[in-house]
């Protein structure tokens, strides 16, 4: 009986140590992923957009990209860029 209880307590201790290791690894991975997302976001903010992308709000100063056209779409209360059924040339 003592051996069975000792085995169960030992198994619980091993599981606790393993789960602590997984949590630490998961937290480090989460922090690394968050840092990567912030880097990508900062890089995209520095690029100047020449045109509005799909479903972006459009008006005269900011035209839609070449393969999009500015249209009024109900129930949206402003103009958005929608596909004009052409493909951009690369």
Curated annotation (Swiss-Prot):
Entry comment describing in which tissues the protein is expressed: Expressed by the venom gland.
Entry annotated with the keyword Signal: yes
Matching InterPro entries: Huwentoxin-1
Signal peptide: 1-19
UniProtKB keywords: Disulfide bond, Ion channel impairing toxin, Knottin, Secreted, Signal, Toxin
Residue stretch(es) of the prosequence: 20-50
Cystine pairs: 51-65, 58-70, 64-81
One annotated GO molecular function: toxin activity
Keyword Calcium: no
A single GO cellular-component term on record: extracellular region
Main localization (coarse): secreted
Places the protein is found: Secreted
Domain of life of the organism encoding this protein: Eukaryota
Function: Ion channel inhibitor.
Entry domain remark: The presence of a 'disulfide through disulfide knot' structurally defines this protein as a knottin.
Family according to the record: Belongs to the neurotoxin 10 (Hwtx-1) family. 13 (Hntx-13) subfamily.
Protein name per UniProt: U7-theraphotoxin-Hhn1l
């Amino acid at each position: 009986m003592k051996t069975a209880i000792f085995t169960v307590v030992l198994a619980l201790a091993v599981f606790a140590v393993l789960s602590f290791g997984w949590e630490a690894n998961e937290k480090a991975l989460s922090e690394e992923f968050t840092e990567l997302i912030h880097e990508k976001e900062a890089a995209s903010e520095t690029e100047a957009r020449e045109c509005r992308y799909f479903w972006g709000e459009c008006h005269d100063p900011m035209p839609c990209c070449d393969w999009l056209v500015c249209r009024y779409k109900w129930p949206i209360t402003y103009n958005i860029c929608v596909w004009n059924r052409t493909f951009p040339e690369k």
